[in-house]
A protein has these predicted regions:
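Active-site-proximal, structured, solvent-exposed surfaces of multi-pass membrane proteins
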Residues: 1, 5-236
Length: 236
């Protein structure tokens, strides 16, 4: 499941380390991924997952055929990888010769160490907002093996109709998946209310203790939200 789908699923149940203790919850999620038409500007699609931008600033635009209104909207990127190339490689001898010696030297100096780029970002432009996704390459000191990302545009009555991904640098970009996901808000309130129908009553708080009473109609899991801190333990 993607992060938005996981968020949606937690309105139907809870994740347990041990399985088989309770029946599995039936997922009734309202998260959808609307179909989108892709348009490329300054970008070549080499295969199903690989895109080549010969110059800085290439664009990939996704237009949603049937936009989803009144929802929480996220842009999902899975399996991202980036290999830097020099924009000089995409220039012909005629183009280079047409430049002045001064401009040519400046350009060569600008891209002398293009292959050393340790990070790259995706700039997101849409009709409901803008965003940015940072990707650290394996040669970065901040690299942590992360290749999947989600940018959350939040909730809005207005549907996302179009999103443009700006590729800032020349190079090869790989994406296993580029998609818009929308969690509809129609049933969120009712599902949240259902989760809290049987809750802890007469709560008492003490030093290292929390007490209360609860009546359930079936075997259930009691979820208690506590501020995170190291050193916590629970005895029931």
């Amino acid at each position: 499941l993607t992060p938005l789908q996981k968020q949606d699923a937690l309105l139907d149940g809870v994740v347990l380390e041990e399985t088989g203790l309770l029946p599995e919850a039936e997922l009734t999620g309202d998260t959808v991924s609307p179909a989108a038409e892709m348009e490329l500007d300054g970008v070549q699609q080499l295969d199903e997952t690989t895109y080549y931008a010969p110059q800085d600033g290439g664009r990939i635009t996704l237009t949603i055929a049937q936009p989803v209104a009144d929802c929480e909207t996220a842009f999902v990127v899975q399996g991202m990888q980036y290999t830097a190339t020099s924009p000089l490689d995409a220039m012909s001898e005629e183009e280079l010769s047409a430049m002045s010696a001064h401009d040519r030297r400046n350009l060569q100096k600008q891209y002398a160490h293009f292959w050393r780029k340790d990070s790259v970002y995706l700039r997101l432009l849409s009709n409901i907002g803008e965003g940015r996704i940072e990707y650290n390459r394996p040669n970065s000191q901040y690299y942590c093996g992360r290749h999947d990302f989600v940018y959350n545009f939040g909730t809005s009555d207005e549907p996302l109709q179009q999103i443009t991904i700006v590729l800032p640098f020349a190079g090869y970009y790989q994406f296993d998946r580029l998609a818009v996901e929308c969690q509809k808000l129609d049933t969120v309130a009712a599902r949240a209310e259902n989760l809290g129908a049987e809750n802890l009553q007469n709560v008492t708080l003490g030093t290292n203790s929390l007490g209360g009473e609860i009546t359930t109609t079936r075997s259930s899991v009691l979820v208690v939200q506590l501020p995170y801190s190291t050193g916590w333990s629970v005895t029931v």
